[in-house]
Regions:
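Beta-rich, blade/repeat-based domains predominating
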Residues: 1-2, 6, 40-61, 91-122, ...
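Short loop/turn segments immediately following the C-termini of beta-strands
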Residues: 8-10, 66-68, 76, 86, ...
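A short loop-to-beta-strand structural motif that recurs across blades of beta-propeller domains
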Residues: 20-23, 70-72, 132-134, 180
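Short loop/turn segments that connect beta-strands within beta-propeller blades
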Residues: 26-30, 75-79, 137-141
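Beta-propeller fold detector
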Residues: 33-38, 81-97, 143-157
Length: 180
């Protein structure tokens, strides 16, 4: 078993200092067995790579970019990475403010939540500052233009604004920041 630890390389949200990376920890030995560094073009100077899901079927890791809307795909077969749905409406914040515990939260957060349904080979994603849950089949994910990929994305639900998602036993579970 492995643990993937994401280093955003963006301290205090002040910009990426060098390529974001994943540390791969072997849980049996408790040792770092490798470092996966994102390729140029997979991130922007203001990126904040936030959350990830490992797809053992496709041998890829899917990540969200919460600062510069988009998803990042890391291919474990050839150690390359690329962006998809970059600055696309499905990965962008839908609102400028949320109400959290009765107080306005005015920092729009782009693509944030991500969940992987390994039974149906579906990747779900959601902007934190938004109410739309989107999905794409993992077989449709490829290095392609936004327009080509956008045709394969579907809106599956209107939800609360989540800061956390998981797929478990046939269900997508989402947090709801505004209704705690």
């Amino acid at each position: 078993d492995k643990l993937y630890v994401l280093d955003t390389r963006n301290p205090m949200f002040e910009g990426v200092v060098d390529a974001p990376r994943l540390f791969v920890v072997d849980l049996a030995s408790n040792e770092i067995e490798g470092t996966l560094i994102l390729s140029e073009g997979a991130y922007h100077p203001d990126s904040y790579i936030n959350d990830l899901r490992v797809d053992e079927k496709t041998n890829r890791i899917y990540m969200t970019d919460s600062a510069h809307a988009g998803l990042v795909v890391y291919n474990l077969d050839d150690n390359t990475s690329y962006r998809i749905l970059d600055n696309h409406k499905t990965t962008k914040a839908e609102v400028d403010a949320l109400s959290i515990q009765g107080k306005p939260f005015t920092m729009p957060v782009q693509s944030d939540g991500i969940a992987l349904d390994t039974l149906n080979d579906t990747l779900y994603f959601h902007a934190l500052s938004g109410y739309s849950l989107y999905a794409i089949n993992t077989s449709d994910i490829e290095k392609s233009s936004n327009d080509v990929l956008a045709e394969k994305v579907r809106k599956v639900a209107t939800t609360g604004a989540p800061d956390g998602m998981i797929f478990h036993q046939g269900n997508v579970y989402l947090a709801d920041l505004e209704k705690q």
